[in-house]
């Protein structure tokens, strides 16, 4: 049952084609694509790979109109030399990562005109993600008419959080208008919880976990029995941890102060989302790899950015712990969580009193889907590879089998 997956962002797109999807085994995609729209002002950098092989360049597109200009990339799935499919009709479903589903959607959903309209109406809450997802939905409807498309929402996993975790201490009338904490990265938080249960050899229903999705966007989730009971992101993906270019949580009084000084809303939005976090503090980059290299060279602001990132990460791990009765495992995932050993080491330093103790050799050894704790640590520390595309394909398959 070939399933095509799209994961669209404001400046990039990732796509995977799965020939088959096993519900409990992560499957290597038949085909993958990465598109970087920010590569050059007038050109998108496109790479593809087949069956987990090396990445190869795909003919660059001059001045593409975003995702809507990528028809030739998707047509290469069934046209031309080396295409993995004989015909477009072999594709049985298309899955889309949709970042914000509000309180409307608690599970993967077949995309209808009504669902599409709802995604559009929620775009102001995820302006970097919902509009590109809509572009992908509309492009593939043109290329592959009649093939079911499924929205898998990043917010869905968190929609059953207790009211005390989901609401803000604001006038209750605001909550009635939909202003509440939705949470994000739910696709990967849920995947990490299920994978942690497999690694630990224990039923998910009995586990209490903190999952750390650390990439350019960062969030934590407290998970009890497979259900999210708290998370760090809120009404938008701006709340919570310090991130690559996002500030995370700050005193709202600062924003009021800047508005009174004459800063307009658009400028404030740009600074908080694109010019803060690691980027804003270091003045160098939003990429943790660049920060770590600069620290080695003695760059003071890179070190400050790293220390701020770790301080806020540890603080929020503590906050998530308060929503649990105990902690069975701390899970690291995402680009930083999986690849930055110094971040994991600093986050777990001196946490022996909580039962957290990592093995420095295991931590430094590029771990994937494994336990990096010392043998006698009561709380296990896991590194789990983010597999959002596979999780989306799996969700599509389950939904279509139920229909």
From Swiss-Prot:
Reaction equation(s) it catalyzes = acetate + ATP = acetyl phosphate + ADP
Protein location: Cytoplasm
List of catalytic residues: 154 (proton donor/acceptor)
Binding positions (substrate): 97
Site note Transition state stabilizer applies to: 185, 246
Q: Which residues bind ATP?
A: 14, 213-217, 287-289, 335-339
Looking up Gene3D superfamilies in the UniProt record yields: 3.30.420.40
Q: Where does Mg(2+) bind?
A: 7, 388
Top-level division of the source organism's lineage: Bacteria
Under the heading InterPro entries, the entry gives: Ac/propionate_kinase, Aliphatic_acid_kin_short-chain, Aliphatic_acid_kinase_CS, ATPase_NBD
**In what pathway does it function?**
Metabolic intermediate biosynthesis; acetyl-CoA biosynthesis; acetyl-CoA from acetate: step 1/2
Enzyme class, broadest EC rank: transferase
What is the residue range of the signal peptide feature? none
A biological-process GO annotation: acetyl-CoA biosynthetic process
Give the UniProt entry's GO cellular component terms.
Answer: cytoplasm
Q: Which cofactor does it need?
A: Mg(2+); Mn(2+)
Which CDD domains did the record assign? ASKHA_NBD_AcK_PK
Give the family, as the similarity comment puts it.
Belongs to the acetokinase family.
Task: Report the NCBIfam families cross-referenced here.
Answer: ackA
Protein function: Catalyzes the formation of acetyl phosphate from acetate and ATP. Can also catalyze the reverse reaction.
Listed name of the protein: Acetate kinase
Organism annotation: Synechococcus sp. (strain JA-3-3Ab) (Cyanobacteria bacterium Yellowstone A-Prime)
């Amino acid at each position: 049952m070939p399933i095509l997956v799209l994961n669209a962002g404001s400046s990039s797109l990732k796509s995977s084609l799965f020939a088959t999807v096993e519900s409990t085994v992560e499957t290597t995609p038949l085909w993958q694509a990465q598109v970087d729209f920010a590569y050059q002002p007038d050109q998108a950098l496109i790479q593809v790979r087949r069956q987990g092989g090396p990445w190869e360049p795909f003919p660059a597109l001059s001045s593409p109109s975003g995702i809507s200009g990528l028809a030739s990339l998707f047509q290469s799935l069934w046209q031309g030399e080396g295409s993995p499919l004989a015909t477009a009709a072999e594709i049985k479903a298309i899955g889309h990562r949709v970042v914000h589903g509000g309180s409307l959607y608690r599970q993967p959903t077949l995309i209808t005109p009504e669902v599409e309209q709802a995604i559009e109406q929620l775009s102001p809450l995820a302006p970097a993600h919902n509009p590109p997802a809509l572009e992908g939905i509309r492009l593939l409807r043109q290329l592959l008419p009649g093939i079911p498309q499924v929205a898998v929402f990043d917010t869905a996993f968190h929609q059953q959080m207790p009211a005390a975790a989901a609401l803000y201490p604001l006038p209750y009338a605001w909550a009635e208008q939909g202003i509440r904490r939705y949470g994000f990265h739910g696709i990967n938080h849920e995947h990490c919880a299920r994978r942690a249960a497999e690694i630990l050899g224990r039923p998910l229903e009995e586990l209490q976990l903190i999952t750390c999705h650390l990439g350019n966007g960062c969030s934590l989730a407290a998970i009890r029995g497979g259900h999210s009971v708290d998370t760090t992101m809120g009404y938008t993906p701006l709340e919570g941890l310090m991130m690559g270019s996002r500030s995370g949580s700050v005193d709202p009084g600062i924003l009021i102060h800047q508005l009174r000084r004459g800063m307009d809303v658009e400028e404030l939005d740009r600074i908080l989302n694109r010019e803060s976090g690691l980027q804003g503090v270091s003045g160098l980059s939003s990429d943790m790899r660049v920060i770590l290299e600069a620290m080695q060279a003695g760059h003071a602001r890179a070190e400050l950015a790293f220390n701020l990132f770790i301080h806020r990460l540890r603080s929020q791990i503590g906050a998530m712990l308060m929503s649990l009765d105990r902690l069975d495992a701390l899970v690291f995932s995402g680009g930083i969580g999986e690849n930055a050993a110094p971040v994991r080491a600093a986050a777990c330093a001196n946490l022996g009193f909580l039962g957290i103790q990592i093995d420095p050799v295991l931590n430094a050894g590029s771990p994937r889907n494994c336990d990096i704790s010392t043998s006698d640590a009561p709380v296990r520390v896991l590194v789990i590879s983010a597999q959002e595309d596979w999780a989306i394909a799996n969700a599509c398959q389950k939904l279509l089998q139920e229909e």
